[in-house]
């Protein structure tokens, strides 16, 4: 299945993402370093049961890079701010999180901050921060 990547501007930077299917949102967050490409084999199947949304995290995949390797936008909090605003801009609700590696820590925080929007969490090779 070929799906064209879309782009949205978040905090003045372009975030690339895939968005296809209908129904409850299945938000898939990749690890570091990686990209939405990680989910290429499972996403088409999941799109038959829901709306699959897969961003390339800031600085990864086809998303825009930040200036300077020590840019605070690459910190955990910086990454989280991009994901949080991404979800707000796309009005994501009824979210099933599918999270991996670095994306798991971001997803767990998203679940903590917006528990009313999260329906389920599936995680792999997770990084767990204190709640």
Predicted segment positions?
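Alpha/beta-hydrolase fold catalytic core
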Residues: 1-26, 47-51, 68-70, 74, ...
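Active-site donor-binding loop signature of nucleotide-sugar glycosyltransferases
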Residues: 10, 57, 126
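Conserved HGGG/HGGXW glycine-rich cap/lid loop of the alpha/beta-hydrolase fold
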Residues: 13, 18-65, 86
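Short, hydrophobic alpha-helix immediately C-terminal to the catalytic nucleophile
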Residues: 40, 84, 108-112
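Residues in and immediately flanking transmembrane alpha helices
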Residues: 43, 69, 113-114
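Active-site loop/oxyanion-hole signature of alpha/beta-hydrolase fold enzymes
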Residues: 54-99
């Amino acid at each position: 299945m070929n799906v064209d990547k879309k782009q949205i501007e978040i905090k003045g930077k372009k975030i690339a993402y895939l968005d296809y299917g209908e129904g409850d949102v299945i938000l898939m967050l990749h690890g570091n370093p990686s990209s939405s490409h990680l989910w290429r084999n499972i996403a088409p199947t999941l799109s038959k049961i829901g709306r699959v949304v897969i961003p390339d995290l800031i600085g990864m995949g086809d998303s825009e890079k930040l200036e300077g390797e020590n840019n605070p936008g690459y910190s955990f909090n910086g990454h989280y701010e991009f994901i949080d605003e991404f979800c707000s801009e796309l009005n994501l609700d009824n979210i099933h999180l599918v999270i991996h590696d670095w994306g798991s820590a971001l997803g767990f925080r998203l679940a903590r901050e917006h528990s009313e929007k999260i329906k389920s969490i599936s995680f792999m090779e997770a990084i767990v921060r204190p709640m």
